[in-house]
């Protein structure tokens, strides 16, 4: 007969207690591993250290930003164009969306357009560039900053077009730019290729204009 005297636990209680303890240890281990994975993904993403204060963004975007944070667009393979002048919070919002994706286990990668084009052009001859491009191919989300901030050369535009067309087949891309989309054609030599690029990236895309508060 099991001893039920105060100060002693029954054999059933003891077994249950041990099981609870093991479950607690397992849960803690899973939490540690999940956190370590997030840290690893954050480091690999090359995201800038930006803190997104959503309260500092245009008030008219609150509902849209809340919807974006649900990541439905990412699961559906949509692109996003963040458009606005300097200091309107484009990068902060891009980082916020990327970190939200990382929290859900998605691989992401950030690069300014000049870095992105350099990686694409040198991926077959430079091991570091090759590794970066290979990682991009594993990602669910890529962020390209400063799109057409400076006019690309013909060869740069061609490299950009080829890479975006390839990568956009199976993943979402966030394009960050301070240049109105309608003026992209004005800064390139090959306007036909640029128009083809525009048609491609805007076919399944949300365009978000950020303005001063």
Residue ranges and their predicted role:
Residues 77-93:
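Walker A/P-loop nucleotide-binding motif
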Residues 49-69:
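N-terminal pre-Walker A segment at the start of P-loop NTPase domains
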Residues 99-111:
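Post-Walker A helix-loop "phosphate-sensing" segment adjacent to the P-loop in P-loop NTPases
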Residues 2-46:
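Interdomain "pre-motor" coupling segment immediately N-terminal to P-loop NTPase/helicase cores
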Residues 69-77:
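Phosphate-binding P-loop
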């Amino acid at each position: 007969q099991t001893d039920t005297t105060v100060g002693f636990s029954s054999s059933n209680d003891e077994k249950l207690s041990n099981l609870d303890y093991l479950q607690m240890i397992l849960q803690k281990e899973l939490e540690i591993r999940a956190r370590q994975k997030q840290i690893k993904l954050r480091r690999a993403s090359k995201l800038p250290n930006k803190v997104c204060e959503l309260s500092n963004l245009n008030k008219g975007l609150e509902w849209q930003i809340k919807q974006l944070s649900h990541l439905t667009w990412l699961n559906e393979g949509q692109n996003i164009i963040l458009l606005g002048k300097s200091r309107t919070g484009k990068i902060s919002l891009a980082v916020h969306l990327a970190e939200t994706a990382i929290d859900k286990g998605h691989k992401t990668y950030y690069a300014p357009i000049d870095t992105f084009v350099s990686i694409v052009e040198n991926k077959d001859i430079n091991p570091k560039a090759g590794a970066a491009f290979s990682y991009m191919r594993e990602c669910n989300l890529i962020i390209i900053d400063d799109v057409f901030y400076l006019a690309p050369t013909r060869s740069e535009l061609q490299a950009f077009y080829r890479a975006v067309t390839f990568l956009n087949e199976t993943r979402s891309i966030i394009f960050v730019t301070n240049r109105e989309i309608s003026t992209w054609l004005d800064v390139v030599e090959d306007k036909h290729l640029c128009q083809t690029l525009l048609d491609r990236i805007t076919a399944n895309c949300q365009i978000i204009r950020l303005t001063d508060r």
